[in-house]
């Protein structure tokens, strides 16, 4: 257990920038992207100096389904495309136990994936034991990913993080899937992690922009001792997007934090390559702000918009109802039920 809290005032703060454009960003394009575009983005990220590049369906390996959204290509086609052009960064993927299996993990490893984030709901870390331990056996860098972290109090979340550490995770994330956490919420959770985790266990932050706080939350996290930061080109991701990598890197420069990223190269990739792929602007607007306000899983946005159009509803009505019911990832099908209930009351 750590006895001191690291601070970002130290001259030796070195960040590990994990890009999620090609995983969380899949939600923004309904999991449709060509392997050719994956290669272009992955190559640009590798050249720009990010430490790791995550590639998979938005809901992780084997996420292709009617519930989560069928992809235009398989995980394997996307991973192979990225692996062919990534020479410096660690090729990473996401796995949700119950969706992806150990078999998929092993196949990803064989294709060149070096790092995996094993994701569970914030109170269900115990289901990650087999996948984390197997990843360690495969010689992979392994992180635990506690989704919807705002739904667990700091101490409870830290206890779940400790479980993931005990299974072999090198790092555990505060994962703000709903973009609901404010700076104080992030600060409290990172401190709770640091108080209970071993000093050598790293801590990560995965922020969403739904309340326009993703950069601020990531900065606060680093100030409290986080070293791994998730970000994406142009914030490309579910809901209002992830922490946009360009402004975060700019702020890191202003703080004097060490990293390997080329800011201008990231800006060019964001504006020239990623933004043109978006069929819906990834931004804070009335729908995505409601995600954060109601604490709703960011990937529910497109599902709610589809249901709203089908049943003549305001997307915000659906999202508020989803938040009231406390739906979590994997319950996308219930969005239609909620829409039907709301439509019947009109």
UniProtKB/Swiss-Prot annotation:
Binding positions for substrate per the UniProt entry: 23-24, 177, 206, 297
Q: Which UniProt keywords apply?
A: Aromatic hydrocarbons catabolism, Lyase, Manganese, Metal-binding
EC class, as a word, reads lyase
Catalytic activity, as annotated: (S)-4-hydroxy-2-oxopentanoate = acetaldehyde + pyruvate
Tell me the ranges covered by the Pyruvate carboxyltransferase domain, including all copies. Answer: 15-267
Q: Name one GO biological process term.
A: catabolic process
User: Which Pfam families would you find in this protein's record?
Assistant: DmpG_comm, HMGL-like
Q: What PROSITE patterns does the database record attribute to this sequence?
A: PYR_CT (PS50991)
Q: Report the EC code(s) recorded for this entry.
A: 4.1.3.39
Q: Which residues carry out catalysis?
A: 27 (proton acceptor)
Which positions does the site annotation Transition state stabilizer cover? 23
Gene3D superfamilies, per the entry: 1.10.8.60, Aldolase class I (3.20.20.70)
Give binding positions for Mn(2+): 24, 206, 208
One annotated GO molecular function is:
2-isopropylmalate synthase activity
PANTHER family listed in its UniProt record: 2-ISOPROPYLMALATE SYNTHASE 1, CHLOROPLASTIC-RELATED, HOMOCITRATE SYNTHASE-RELATED
Q: State the family named in the UniProt similarity comment for this chain.
A: Belongs to the 4-hydroxy-2-oxovalerate aldolase family.
Q: Know the name of this protein?
A: 4-hydroxy-2-oxovalerate aldolase 1
What high-level taxonomic lineage is stated for the organism?
Answer: Bacteria, Bacillati, Actinomycetota, Actinomycetes, Mycobacteriales
